[in-house]
Amino acid sequence: YKVRLYDITNGIDQAQNIGDTESFISTTGLSPMTSIGIVDNSDIDIYLLAGNKIVKYTTKGMEQSESPARIFAYGLSYDETEDGYTINFNLNEDATSVNLILNNPETGEAVQTIALGALPKGANQTTISRADLPAEKLNWSIQAIAGNVTKFTKISDDSPLYQYYAPYGVAIDKSPESDYFGRIYITNTAAGTVSAGNPSQAQTSTVGVYVLGADISDITQQGSTAYSGTISWSGETGMGPRKAAVASDGRVFLCDASTNNAGIYLMNPETFDISSIFTGATNSNGSLMIGGKYVCGQITAVGIRGEGATTQLYAIDKTASGSSWKKFINVYNIGESNTWTTAPNESKAASSYVGNDNSSIVPVSTGYWAAQYRGGGSNSPANPCMFYYSDQYQDAVFNTAEPNIIGESSQNGALAVNEKEQLIALSVNGGVAVYSYKMKEGIPSVTEKFRKEIAEMGGYVNDFEFDYAGNLYAVSNAGERLAVWAMPTSDNSCVTPAKKSLVLNNIYTGIENAVSISRISPNPTTGIITISAQNTIETVEIYNIAGSLVMRQAHVGTTTTSLDLSDLAGGMYFVKVNDGKAVKVIKK
């Protein structure tokens, strides 16, 4: 008697036999039999009952092959010549195969897929000639494929770039249209030297924001000093900058829960300047007022959704209700603006609401998810560990107390939502609980998938975040760490589209990225230059004669812009618009 295992990824009607267990039961004649399997994260126990005999098969304690990270491509760009293009991209993991996909720019439909084979982690490139392009203009994307992630796999370590003394927030730029796609932002609320876990190279952290590349590199060369702007952060653990959210255009919003610095701040992802979005506000004991109107209070968490003019900023406000226990959710239809000078578009608490300061909010396309720290046995309909607010019903329509699916502590209210895969990560009982959900008539049905203790987090997690591929990031003040795990998947593939401005043309126009510089004046110059282009300018870069980038202007959005070269030494420089051809300019 044996148990036969089938792969039903493609449905029971297309089940594939993947193997049989060894036979440990034999009887004379046929006997009644049954089997059952119990899955625990990446392990499985299989029980076989035949006649009056039973046998258990298990994978626990057995060495299993290492799982890769969930893979994706980032840093997509190209170099153009008269004959064609060199396509550049980076991979966060070794790929078993990579495809260059050419898309119709109008419909998004794939026109051609070009196999690039297996490629290593890191920088890669391929070439394509104009003659091989099947249409006059094409968008393109990179599909990366790697081996399955068979279990919840830690892919971080204890090196200095994972160490932070008092981290409270982690946010990732997940918009391929952003100039900063893939960047990871960690907020650190207090200064000190990391000691948790006894690291061999202990990192000393300052108060502010740390920025990592998608490959966990110090992409901005900031070293151990956080970006803090000109804000006098309190330096008190958990106050500010507390948590972060990244808009689709790369803007980084930060919140502060202290009395003196209450509110929401904007960090420029190019210059790392930080300023309050509430220009001209007066602070009265943690309440911000502009023109006699309440605009914001002490904020424990922020989230963001939408893009462009439809961008909405969500904030958990511990001041607005007048009661520190019952917190309001403020909604600001901020769009493309960097400031806000009036009352929130919405400010209220739902029937299930946030009561604890240790909380999170994740807006999705149909509403928002929120979570908070609740002690063991304290999960209730009014103050649940987690709830979902529906835009359709204008109230909370799900909470973890009805039915009660969490009996343990949800310290410290860390939450991440992968809307594409309908997955939730919630801090539970010193680790993570992962749930799947399905929407029916606007109401989610939530099912626990697995739980995993995370000992290195020191007993609780302060914030979770999924990256573009679905890897899970976590920060813990107690554990003094950023940690990263690959989420289990049987389809470890991801398509990253290039920016829409990076159009491939089968006819050489001499205009790279569909933008050429029409005029730079005055040239030569003693200071300010004005650049005019035929189409919309997204970025302007200035290089010195050695090829080093000395100035950059991003998110221009017009056909004309000005830059001040007064601080540059006299000499020859090169101006590039949208990574196009360089034009010489002389600085006197």
Predicted regions and their residues:
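Conserved beta-propeller blade signature
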Residues: 1, 45-48, 177-187, 251-255, ...
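Short glycine/acidic-enriched loop and turn motifs that connect beta-strands
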Residues: 1, 53-55, 190-195, 258-261, ...
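Beta-propeller fold detector
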Residues: 13-25, 152-159, 208-235, 273-291, ...
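Repeated scaffold domains used in trafficking and secretory/extracellular systems
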Residues: 29-38, 164-173, 232-245, 284-305, ...
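Blade-level signature of beta-propeller repeat domains, shared across WD40, Kelch, NHL, RCC1
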Residues: 33-66, 458-508
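Residue-level detector of functionally pivotal "anchor" positions at catalytic/ligand-binding pockets or at interdomain
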Residues: 60-78, 485, 489-521, 527, ...
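Structural beta-strand segments of beta-rich domains
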Residues: 83-87, 527-529
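C-terminal outer-membrane/trafficking sorting elements
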Residues: 97-119, 133-144, 510-588
